[in-house]
């Protein structure tokens, strides 16, 4: 079978020019053709000028590739009007109106005041918005990281609760214990701090002074300090003085009272205040308890640091974002506590009349004070409370060494005792508080409320120390850094008087609950055999554990600290 024959069609070839022939054949008649017109707007093969047609969507792309359309034309074909109308100018030939120059001056003065007011408002808005911008940027970064975490699966494997048992896997911050627990220590009891809020021991009368056991001399308060304000601040001076840090068992007065049967439970005001405010504390602390016969001594460990964890003046402990315990820089919890200690020691000495005659108690010096080193500027009163019958049916008689910082002339020239403490501002942008230098004069209550919220445990301890000592008034100071990046220089911005009983109700400090907590701890220790025990607040959970300690625990630390003190004296 023969295959079909393939024949090529004949094509018209223009040998004398470019383009089709002038006379088309019959084969080309069905093909439409339009003659070339010079008025047509012809685009280019690659038009890089007409960029306005790129990224068009939907019906906007209609007719953009039609021959002669405006979308294919370059800007070189656009019509430009040659006449420049900017050269024309209208001339006002009317006669100007005469104006009152005094009125113009008043108008200009009013405009100037408005401009200055707007400028001041703008500056305040900029200062206030700086922190807001920082918080917004941090929130955006956290939101971005959270979205990235969700894209990668999130906590799908762990359900709604992640590691640590908290919603979204929010693990608690790592806090170090105040003392390292050793394997030979035995846990005898765990006390849940959340249950402490339900305890109450009502009808506890005020403490009584024990005989003539009142020691020291105090200076009168300098009332010129009350004129201090943010605008009239004064620098915090570095006042020389002695600070005595005597434990309960080393106090010769307490030893004498214990031998004389003055009580069966002994402690200092700061130790008892720490126990009574335990539900408010966040950081770890520890208290040593000695059971000797039918008596109980609450004591503190001898550490190489200036202060024991019980006496540490924590800063922003109960805030939403507390400082890291041992981080880099000057704003870690340990260095801030040391700074607060020096501020309080200098503040309580600066606000009294150190060169004038003071008020002397029945004994000018305490037995543990050294005559050669000088006075400490602190008075000590030994007081006693009856806390009812204990677990063995015998009455619980509490003996406490309390401290006072100054005296002041009250109504009728009556001498009243003072407890002097100071708040310290370190960096308002990091502490979550308010700027004292802008808010303290006009919003003192808001600043105090913020400090009470961020330092709930410390403020409660101060109030309890004043109540245990029978202090008539508390004097609170506000001390701020001159430079947020330096801890060398500080200024006193303001001072404030508060009554201890009224202040306790303002900070929701219930004395019946505090006595109930202390009595619960005393009963737990009294149930144990004579020996040495340790009460330690857990750093991660609201729990106090009672440990039984072997004989000789912490004795090496005591000996090493004594050797260091003897070397310093030499």
Curated annotation (Swiss-Prot):
UniProt keyword annotation of Cytoplasm present: yes
Isomerase in keyword set: no
Record's keyword terms, sorted: Cytoplasm, Initiation factor, Protein biosynthesis, RNA-binding
Chief location category: cytoplasm
Region forming the signal peptide: none
GO CC list: eukaryotic 43S preinitiation complex; eukaryotic 48S preinitiation complex; eukaryotic translation initiation factor 3 complex
Region annotation (Disordered) ranges: 150-175, 551-570
BP term (GO), one: formation of cytoplasmic translation initiation complex
Region feature (RNA gate): 309-323
Compositionally biased spans, kind Low complexity: 151-160
Pfam entry (one): eIF-3_zeta
Acidic residues compositional bias, start-end: 560-570
Record text on subunit structure and interactions: Component of the eukaryotic translation initiation factor 3 (eIF-3) complex.
Protein family membership: Belongs to the eIF-3 subunit D family.
Function recorded in the entry: mRNA cap-binding component of the eukaryotic translation initiation factor 3 (eIF-3) complex, which is involved in protein synthesis of a specialized repertoire of mRNAs and, together with other initiation factors, stimulates binding of mRNA and methionyl-tRNAi to the 40S ribosome. The eIF-3 complex specifically targets and initiates translation of a subset of mRNAs involved in cell proliferation. In the eIF-3 complex, eif3d specifically recognizes and binds the 7-methylguanosine cap of a subset of mRNAs.
PANTHER family: EUKARYOTIC TRANSLATION INITIATION FACTOR 3 SUBUNIT 7 (PTHR12399), EUKARYOTIC TRANSLATION INITIATION FACTOR 3 SUBUNIT D (PTHR12399:SF0)
Protein name (database record): Eukaryotic translation initiation factor 3 subunit D
């Amino acid at each position: 079978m023969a295959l079909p024959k393939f024949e090529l069609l004949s094509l018209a070839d223009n040998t004398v020019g470019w383009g089709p022939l002038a006379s088309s054949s019959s084969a080309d008649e069905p093909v439409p053709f339009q003659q070339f017109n010079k008025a047509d707007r012809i685009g280019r093969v690659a038009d890089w000028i007409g960029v306005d047609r790129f990224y068009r969507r939907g019906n906007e792309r209609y007719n953009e590739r039609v021959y002669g359309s405006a979308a294919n034309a370059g800007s070189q074909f656009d019509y430009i009007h040659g006449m420049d109308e900017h050269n024309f100018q209208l001339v006002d030939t009317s006669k100007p109106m005469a104006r009152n120059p005094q009125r113009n001056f008043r108008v200009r003065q009013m405009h100037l005041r408005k401009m200055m007011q707007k400028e001041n408002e703008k500056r305040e808005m900029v200062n206030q918005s700086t922190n807001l911008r920082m918080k917004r940027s941090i929130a955006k970064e956290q939101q971005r990281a959270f979205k990235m975490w969700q894209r990668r699966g999130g906590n799908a494997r762990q359900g709604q609760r992640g590691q640590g048992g908290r919603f979204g896997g929010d693990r608690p911050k790592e806090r170090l214990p105040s003392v390292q627990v050793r394997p030979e220590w035995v846990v005898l009891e765990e006390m849940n701090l959340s249950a402490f809020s339900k305890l109450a021991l009502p009808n506890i009368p005020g403490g009584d002074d024990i005989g003539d056991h009142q020691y020291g001399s105090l200076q009168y308060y300098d009332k010129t300090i009350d004129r201090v304000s943010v605008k009239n601040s004064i620098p915090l001076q570095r006042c020389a003085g002695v600070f005595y840090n005597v434990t309960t068992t080393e106090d010769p007065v307490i030893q004498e009272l214990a031998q004389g049967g003055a009580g069966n439970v002994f402690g200092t005001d700061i130790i008892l205040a720490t126990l009574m405010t335990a539900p408010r504390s966040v950081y770890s602390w520890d208290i040593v308890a000695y059971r000797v016969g039918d008596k109980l001594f609450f004591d503190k460990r001898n550490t190489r640091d200036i202060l024991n964890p019980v006496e540490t003046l924590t800063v922003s402990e109960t805030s939403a974002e507390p400082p890291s315990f041992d981080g880099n820089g000057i704003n870690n919890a340990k260095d801030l506590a040391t700074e607060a200690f020096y501020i309080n020691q200098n503040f309580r000495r600066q606000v009294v009349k150190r060169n004038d005659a003071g008020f002397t108690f029945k004994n000018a010096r305490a037995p543990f004070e050294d005559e050669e080193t000088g006075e400490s500027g602190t008075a000590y009163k030994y007081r006693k409370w009856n806390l009812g019958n204990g677990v063995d049916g015998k009455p619980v008689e509490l003996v406490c060494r309390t401290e006072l910082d100054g005296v002041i002339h009250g109504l009728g020239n009556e001498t009243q005792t003072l407890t002097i403490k100071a708040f310290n501002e370190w960096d308002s942008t990091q502490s979550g508080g308010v700027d004292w230098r802008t808010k303290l004069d006009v919003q003192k209550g808001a600043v105090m409320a913020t400090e009470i919220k961020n330092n709930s445990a410390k403020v409660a301890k101060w109030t309890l120390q004043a109540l245990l000592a029978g202090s008539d008034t508390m004097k609170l100071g506000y001390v701020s850094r001159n430079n947020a990046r330096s801890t060398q220089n500080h200024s006193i911005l303001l001072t404030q008087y508060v009554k201890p009983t009224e202040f306790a109700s303002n900070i929701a400090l219930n004395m019946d609950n505090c006595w109930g907590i202390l009595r619960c701890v005393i009963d737990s220790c009294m149930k144990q055999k004579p020996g040495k025990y340790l009460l330690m607040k857990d750093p991660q959970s609201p729990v106090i554990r009672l440990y039984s300690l072997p004989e000789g625990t912490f004795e090496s630390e005591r000996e090493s600290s004594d050797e260091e003190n003897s070397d310093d004296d030499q």
